[in-house]
Amino acid sequence: MKKYTCTVCGYIYNPEDGDPDNGVNPGTDFKDIPDDWVCPLCGVGKDQFEEVEE
């Protein structure tokens, strides 16, 4: 699974960790996160994230 970064604040969503504080379980691929999920640091939507090139 690929990591995604917030283009506004630099937060990196790692699917291995998920975002359990906001209802996203570890192992959840970015495409499977609910559309109303927002960046836990700055509050922007999923449309402000882009795939991390590794």
Swiss-Prot record:
The name of this protein is: Rubredoxin
Question: Short name of one Pfam family for this protein?
Answer: Rubredoxin
User: Where is Fe cation annotated to bind?
Assistant: 6, 9, 39, 42
Which sequence positions carry the modification called N-formylmethionine?
1
Instruction: Output the SUPFAM superfamilies linked to this UniProt entry.
Output: Rubredoxin-like
Q: What would you give as a GO molecular function for this chain, any one?
A: iron ion binding
PANTHER family in UniProt: RUBREDOXIN, RUBREDOXIN-1-RELATED
